Amino acid sequence: KGISLDVEKGQVISIIGPSGSGKSTLLRSMNFLEKPNKGKITFDNTEFEVEKMTKKDILDIRKYTTMVFQNYNLFKNKTALNNIIEGLLVVKKMNKEEAEKIGLELLKKVGLEEKRDFYPSQMSGGQQQRIAIARSLAMNPKVILLDEPTSALDPELVGEVLKVIKDIASEHVTMVIVTHEMQFAKEISDKVVFMDNGIIIEEGTPLQLFENPQNNRTKEFLKRYIQRS
């Protein structure tokens, strides 16, 4: 099945659709956590043919993209601050003082300055996800990929994570988000993509997709969502 998706600089794109529709697979294939079978990826005017990509090509793409996972994926034996700066020290070879300065600024940005020396086990799920988002920002990526960032959270913790993502979006950071939070997708996105059965069924602005969907499958999905909420 073929998929074609354009992401412009500074855009926030939300990918919605039923479970098992291929949303996360599409997201993970953007930075080669899952390798696409064939096709082309164009990044910053550089075109890559998937079948011919070398390890260096894949590393180059990963340098400019960061991923925020459902289950945070923090290092359990590192503090909040050390989780954030790990990539700066190991990948970017930054000196510790400079890395910590960036890390502390990002802790402030996600509202967790007081948690700098806390370990993941001492923090709530919402706090851990905010640290994971700060870690992804530390690498100064060109694109942040977020895979259902609130799906593992207790309902009362969802809001704090969505607020952080909204704040980042307001700074025109390019983001692609897989989400089941429809109201959030409606508010934050420049473009919403509806997927089902491994293909893109419909895409458009939030107004187009939520208020005036053209495809019957999109209408059916959104109708169920409205009934549930």
List where the protein language model places each region.
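C-terminal boundary and immediately downstream tail of ABC-type ATPase nucleotide-binding domains
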Residues: 203, 207-229
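ABC family nucleotide-binding domain
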Residues: 1-206
